[in-house]
């Protein structure tokens, strides 16, 4: 888990640069990236695609963007291995998909959402019953967020870890 205040670069590093590097290094793996809104998740998806398509990146790794789109896209390479990237909002459609890497960036938008017990519970339940169940064996989860509330998703997961 990565916790920092807003505007400190956590999304740039963890939701854009890292997934591009990860897909280049693990060209058969699947990434699912979620955020509080579909719009933000799609923005990250587009930025990852642009990073991979950049000349600098292509000088390091020759990877072709096999399919285009903000919601779902794939990479292909000489070995014919396919990596994929799926973007969704919290509570969005990831059922039926698998993830070697699950990125949850800013599951809570602001103080207003954080102060809503209903929203916090909904996010936690989505994580337990949907998001976490998409993880492949030996997969990894990265949660990036500003801590708006002691009982937010990260707070609940930290409490769960203490109990277990």
Where are the regions that the model predicts?
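Glycine-rich phosphate-binding loop of nucleotide-binding enzymes
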Residues: 18-35
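A short acidic (Asp/Glu
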Residues: 12-15, 42-46, 152-158
């Amino acid at each position: 888990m990565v916790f920092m205040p807003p505007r400190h670069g956590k999304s740039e590093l963890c939701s854009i640069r890292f997934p591009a590097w990860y897909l280049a290094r693990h060209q058969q793996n699947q990434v699912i990236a979620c955020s509080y809104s579909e719009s933000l998740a799609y923005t990250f998806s587009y930025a990852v695609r642009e990073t991979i398509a950049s000349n600098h990146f292509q000088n390091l790794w020759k990877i072709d963007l096999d399919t285009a789109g903000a919601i779902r896209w794939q990479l292909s390479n000489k070995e014919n291995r396919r990596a994929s990237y799926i973007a969704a909002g919290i509570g969005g459609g990831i059922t039926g998909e698998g993830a070697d890497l699950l990125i949850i960036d800013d599951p809570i938008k602001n103080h207003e959402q954080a102060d809503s017990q209903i929203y916090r519970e909904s996010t936690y339940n989505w994580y337990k019953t949907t998001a976490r169940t998409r993880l492949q064996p030996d997969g990894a989860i990265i949660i990036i967020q500003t801590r708006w509330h002691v009982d937010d998703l990260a707070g609940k997961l930290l409490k769960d870890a203490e109990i277990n």
